[in-house]
């Protein structure tokens, strides 16, 4: 059975929802899934004053455990067209894994959230994939196999590189049913492809 980690960073809970949906999809695809998050870097008093969702259930991951999985889906908030610093800080601690080649041929995939439609989602998806590529991981994108992202009748998440959600910072727009379905699709797709590669 494929062992998968869904690893995320979420300040306001939007990516937490997407990560849970991806984990559901991966389980539907036959994977044994672990859902974890990266540590918060913002001081607790600042996080509370900024209304961060600090009561997330997922346990905190450690960089060394990434080697324990066949596949890793990363979900991160976006800051100025890049992954959030919390995720970058976590990934920057994986140098020891890189030196050992511990993630070579593992499967990787990425999802992101932005506060606006043009908030740099595709840049964040691609730059996060770069980190995976430096580790020798095999990237499985969302791709246009996920037809739910097609159309412009409403704000739709998704890109060929990975699932996205646009969620307002004030909480007025949460991840849509289409975006959550896309995250499930991505989780299932990664699980199924990983099973073919590592089965």
UniProtKB/Swiss-Prot annotation:
InterPro entries: Flavodoxin/NO_synth (IPR008254), Flavoprotein-like_sf (IPR029039), Flavoprotein_WrbA-like (IPR010089), FMN_Rdtase-like_dom (IPR005025), NQO (IPR037513)
MF (Gene Ontology): flavin adenine dinucleotide binding; FMN binding; NAD binding; NADH:ubiquinone reductase (non-electrogenic) activity; NADP binding; NADPH dehydrogenase (quinone) activity
Cofactor annotation: FMN
Domain Flavodoxin-like positions: 4-190
Alphabetical UniProt keywords: Flavoprotein, FMN, NAD, NADP, Nucleotide-binding, Oxidoreductase
Any one of the GO CC terms: membrane
Cofactor binding: number and manner: Binds 1 FMN per monomer.
Annotated segments matching region Disordered: 157-181
Extent of the signal sequence: none
Residues that hold FMN according to the record: 10-15, 78-80, 113-119, 134
Enzyme class, broadest EC rank: oxidoreductase
Protein family (similarity comment): Belongs to the WrbA family.
NCBIfam families: flav_wrbA (TIGR01755), PRK03767.1 (NF002999)
Protein name: NAD(P)H dehydrogenase (quinone)
Lineage: Bacteria, Pseudomonadati, Pseudomonadota, Alphaproteobacteria, Hyphomicrobiales
């Amino acid at each position: 059975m494929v062992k998968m980690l869904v690893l995320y960073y979420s300040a306001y809970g939007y990516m937490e929802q997407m990560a849970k949906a991806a984990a559901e999809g991966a389980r539907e695809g036959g994977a044994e899934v672990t859902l974890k998050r990266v540590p918060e870097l913002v001081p607790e008093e600042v996080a509370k004053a900024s209304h961060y969702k600090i009561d997330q259930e997922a346990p905190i991951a450690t960089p060394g455990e990434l080697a324990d999985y066949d596949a890793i889906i990363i979900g991160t908030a976006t800051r100025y067209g890049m992954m959030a610093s919390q995720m970058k800080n976590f990934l920057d601690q994986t140098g020891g894994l890189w030196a050992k080649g511990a993630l070579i041929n593992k499967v990787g995939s990425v999802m992101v959230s932005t506060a606006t439609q043009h908030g740099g989602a595709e840049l964040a998806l691609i730059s996060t994939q770069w980190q995976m590529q430096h580790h020798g991981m095999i990237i499985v994108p969302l791709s246009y196999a996920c037809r739910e992202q097609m159309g412009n009748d409403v704000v739709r998440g998704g890109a060929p590189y990975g699932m996205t959600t646009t969620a307002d910072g004030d909480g007025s727009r949460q991840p849509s049913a289409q975006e959550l379905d896309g995250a499930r699709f991505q989780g299932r797709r990664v699980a199924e492809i990983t099973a073919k590669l590592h089965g």
